[in-house]
């Protein structure tokens, strides 16, 4: 009887929604839909009351002498579940077929999950996002992050980064769909209580519209299933999550592209985007704007063997310079623009017990190669913090990466991020032109799984990098980090499940700092910190 009451209650609330969704045209405004929903609710209530009364008459309580059942672990199941802890598995929706009463019930069952998806699809609006925030304190005053891109993130980041995406379907008829997408990202300061955007002391509080584009399906006859987009958007990013930088990243001021175009066994992503840069002179005080354009091409999801896929990628960036810009480079001390490229491949292997590992190989030249040589963050940018400078001479850099997670038995999981890279005759932002470098960084994160909601573990990070300048002088940078943590989670995966709340204690030490001269507070080369951090996406 309890279950019937719940279903009946769900009928009163949900059935009018399903009824109206089938009968309304998508051209109606939200206000018109609400008005019709209210009307449908009033009309349906009387009919449902009659249906409820009939159900009550059919139900005759019976006294049955039965033993208390037990579950698989031997504990007695509760024979009298409380109503406050339960919710219906399904709702009933009214069928609109004219002959429904002749063939059977005029109602059919729909799970709450399916019904929620139906309402969401009917509205055509979604709100997605990400942010992290937390508290921390350290042994020498204010805690400082160091070399996150080499030592790992746990217990080593004190920023409040966010991404917020709004997506609205504006057309969906005759096999064609159009969506409007806007994304904002930025950072909220975690040091001072006030965090007004524009009042940017310390560079903490900022925000931008990173995406603003229209994406469509069904308009291209040769690729009806692909996503065709126009606007401020770039090719999809691929991240080394534990190090917080990207192996694939093409920023864009505006562009046009195609994603998930099925060709042969795999899919093609292609993007043509604009990303102008500020070209500086040798004093780094004066700048000029240079128009650059990037083509990013990827052939992905190529099946290899069981649960293994391959991606092949290529990217080329070229400038569209005016005569005056070239004259400034030739005669006024501005750095010459040099076209730059990157190509490579990646292999992703999923495991039977859950988890995955991704291996990538990338080669780049000129300014992208310069960013391969950065130890703190190594995303493949064409600039350094938005500034283009340096005598690039065609030097190249190579990068090999591994990242993923694996389950060991029922109660252990290990995540990893390992990067080996080297370069020859590149421009280094620390040691100048004609530099060589070699680096290795490794982070492992084993943990004990108590249950679905709790893990305890340690993140261990180490890196070392050596640069050699044009005069063969050597400069070394190295350090290590140990972070003990306990996390509250909603699933056991370390890399793919959020939200997550972390409690941590971190010891971090700079062994050598000849590239950046970094120190913690009080000129110390080490730091002990404790804190808590929340990270969520939806």
UniProtKB/Swiss-Prot annotation:
InterPro entries (UniProt xref): G_neg_Bact_CarbUptk_Porin, LamB-type_porin_N_dom, Porin_LamB, Porin_LamB_sf
Subcellular localization: Cell outer membrane
Signal peptide span: 1-25
Topology relative to the membrane: Multi-pass membrane protein
One Gene Ontology cellular component: cell outer membrane
The keyword Ligase is annotated on this UniProt entry: no
Function: May be a sugar porin with a broad carbohydrate specificity.
Family: Belongs to the porin LamB (TC 1.B.3) family.
UniProt-recorded name of the protein: Putative outer membrane porin BglH
Native organism: Shigella sonnei (strain Ss046)
